[in-house]
Amino acid sequence: MARIAGVDLPRNKRVAIGLTYIYGIGHSKAEEIVEQTGVSTDTRVKDLTEDEVNRLRSTIDNDYTVEGDLRREISMNIKRLMEIGCYRGLRHRRGLPVRGQSTKNNARTRKGPKRTVGAKR
């Protein structure tokens, strides 16, 4: 089983599909990586040679931000927005939608379950 960036790739899938199991690599980036390294697109992960795995590993390590580093970078960006006190940071802090969606009726995913405020008389 090929292990790249701390992730075990599924053995029976094609290489490009297997690479998408790594956080930060989607379909288009996976195709790009396979093309850069010269690995055949039809190759299954279990059929990769050690040399091909090393080429994939080095390409991903050198050219892309993936897994823990990417998660850390994203959380640091959000933390920075919250610290400087900009509008987006305030929305993150309050747990409300950040990108301008209306919150009068929906936004339940971001706001959480309903909390009844008080009965009107």
UniProtKB/Swiss-Prot annotation:
A Pfam family per the record: Ribosomal_S13
Gene Ontology annotations for the cellular component aspect, listed alphabetically: cytosol; small ribosomal subunit
InterPro entries: Rbsml_uS13_C, Ribosomal_uS13, Ribosomal_uS13-like_H2TH, Ribosomal_uS13_bac-type, Ribosomal_uS13_CS
Compositionally skewed regions (Basic residues) per UniProt: 107-121
Keywords: Ribonucleoprotein, Ribosomal protein, RNA-binding, rRNA-binding, tRNA-binding
One GO MF term attached to the UniProt entry: structural constituent of ribosome
Gene3D superfamilies: 1.10.8.50, 30s ribosomal protein s13, domain 2 (4.10.910.10)
GO biological process assignments: translation
KW Zinc-finger (keyword) present: no
Database matches in PROSITE patterns: RIBOSOMAL_S13_1, RIBOSOMAL_S13_2
Region entry Disordered, spans: 94-121
Quaternary context: Part of the 30S ribosomal subunit. Forms a loose heterodimer with protein S19. Forms two bridges to the 50S subunit in the 70S ribosome.
Family to which this protein belongs: Belongs to the universal ribosomal protein uS13 family.
NCBIfam families to which the protein is assigned, alphabetical: uS13_bact
Record function comment: Located at the top of the head of the 30S subunit, it contacts several helices of the 16S rRNA. In the 70S ribosome it contacts the 23S rRNA (bridge B1a) and protein L5 of the 50S subunit (bridge B1b), connecting the 2 subunits; these bridges are implicated in subunit movement. Contacts the tRNAs in the A and P-sites.
PANTHER family the UniProt entry points to: 30S RIBOSOMAL PROTEIN S13/40S RIBOSOMAL PROTEIN S18, SMALL RIBOSOMAL SUBUNIT PROTEIN US13M
Name by which UniProt lists this protein: Small ribosomal subunit protein uS13
